[in-house]
Structure formats: structure tokens, C-alpha cells
């Protein structure tokens, strides 16, 4: 009886796996694209568009943002395809659609490749080649350099891999200017320095998860205290880099005051981590780090709008 049941269930299971996409919902595909990461990419790219010296062309800017968001989603989908084995082990990621079976691995990979291809192609045709090449670099760097090469090999994975997430404002800026200069590279630097502190606070809270998945994060390789000092160092560098737009005349005094206040709060969180025995504060700092970055880029947009209003009047 047992053998007969096993034989009958196998074709059914194969049929379900083969046509799993039919049971997937739009929400599953949205989750596959890591919407929180997409939102960050979209917002920082919009900031790049705003602070560009050239006049913004609404239609091309909209196309550029759609391409950047689609490219970020493509990278997220392929990342979930590749990391499905470790996502299955970790509590934080075990409900992802590639783990629960709502989207099959082959579907996730195909979906990601199609999105990546068309996002880069449309950017090249409708916007310009520089922003298209930068988008391709960002997607490729996240998938190949970070996900496939660094993530499972070194505790410094996020330091190097963070470059991919720092490119959206550069892409947005170049979509308007068709060039790269120190202005957009400053935005790149802020996100690049912010990323390690942001991720390591999360890794402090989920250390056991990463240990089970055998992913070499900094707390496991170098220890908790070393990680906290590293978070403090990168937080300090982030706050310093966030002041650069003022000292290079990209932003004014209002930006400096607001960014400094946000930076002091960020540094306070980093300093208090040393008394955080249960890593509860680490999770709070992780959440604040997202608010901090959004605020910094929002201040730049507000500053631009104020200058634009004064100029028009």
C-alpha cells in the first residue's frame, strides 16, 4: 500500500512543481522582487534626478525610475533563486516565495533574467547609454559579486557588495545629465558607507540564523564587540560623508542642520550598542538606519525644491 501511494503521488507532485507559476499571485512576484529594497533604490534614484543640474524631462525621468526599480527587482528575484537553500534555514527568510513553493526556482530565475534584460534595454533605448551601463553594472554586481561570490565566502561581503545598492542615485543623476561627476559620487559614498552599519545591526540580531545557514557574517567571524566597534566606525563615516553636500555647495544650511541632527541620533544608537546585551537595540538601530538614509535624501530634495522656488520667484 505504501509503495502504491508513493508511486501515485510522484506524477502529481511533478505536475504541480512544473506548473507552480499557475498558483502564484501578483503579491508573490512583488515579494520576489524585494519591495523594501526597490523602494530604497527608487527614492535614492529620484534624489539623483532632482539634484542633477540639467532640466528634468518628466517622461524620460519616469522611464528611468521604472527601469531602475525593475532592475532592482530583477536582482532581488535572482538573489532569492540563488539563496533559496539558505533562506529555507533562516527564520527571517523562510517565508520567501521561493522557499514556501509559491514560486518555483526556475520561474524566479526566468522572471529575474527577463526583468533585468528589459530594464537595461529600455534604459539604453529611451534614456541614455551611461545610465543603462550603470544599471547593468549594479544588477550584475549584486548578483555575481555579492550573492554568488562574496556572501558565503567573507565577512566583508556587505562592505564590497554594498556598491551595488549605492548606484541608484548615480544612475538617476546620469539619466538626466548623461554623465558622472563628484555630485552623484557623493551620494554613492553616503550609501556605500551606510550599508555596513545598516546590515551589521541586523546581523547582530539574527546571528544564530546566519550561523545555522553557515553564512560568514562579521559577528560570527570577528565577534560581537568587534562588530559593534565596526558599526560605530561606519556610522561615524556615514555622518561625516552626509555633511559633504553642504561643504561642496550642493545643499545649504538647512540641510546641514537637519542631517546633523539625524546623524547625532544615528551615532547615539551606535554608541549605545555596547550596553545592548540582548541585541534588542540593534534591531531598533537597524530600523532607524533606514529612516536616517531616507531623511538624508529627503533633505536634499527639500533643499532643491526650496532653491527652485526662490529661483522662480
From Swiss-Prot:
Localization annotation: Cell inner membrane
EC number(s) reported in the record: 2.5.1.141
First-level EC class: transferase
An example Gene Ontology biological process: heme O biosynthetic process
Annotated catalysed reactions: heme b + (2E,6E)-farnesyl diphosphate + H2O = Fe(II)-heme o + diphosphate
Pfam families: UbiA (PF01040)
Membrane topology: Multi-pass membrane protein
Predominant localisation class: membrane
GO molecular function, one term: protoheme IX farnesyltransferase activity
Sorted UniProt keywords: Cell inner membrane, Cell membrane, Heme biosynthesis, Membrane, Transferase, Transmembrane, Transmembrane helix
GO-annotated cellular components: plasma membrane
Recorded metabolic or biological pathway in which this protein acts: Porphyrin-containing compound metabolism; heme O biosynthesis; heme O from protoheme: step 1/1
Membrane spanning residue stretches: 31-51, 58-78, 107-127, 130-150, 157-177, 184-204, 229-249, 250-270, 286-306
Annotated family: Belongs to the UbiA prenyltransferase family. Protoheme IX farnesyltransferase subfamily.
HAMAP family noted in UniProt: CyoE_CtaB
Note: Carbon 2 of the heme B porphyrin ring is defined according to the Fischer nomenclature.
Function of the protein: Converts heme B (protoheme IX) to heme O by substitution of the vinyl group on carbon 2 of heme B porphyrin ring with a hydroxyethyl farnesyl side group.
Descriptive protein name: Protoheme IX farnesyltransferase
Species of origin: Orientia tsutsugamushi (strain Boryong) (Rickettsia tsutsugamushi)
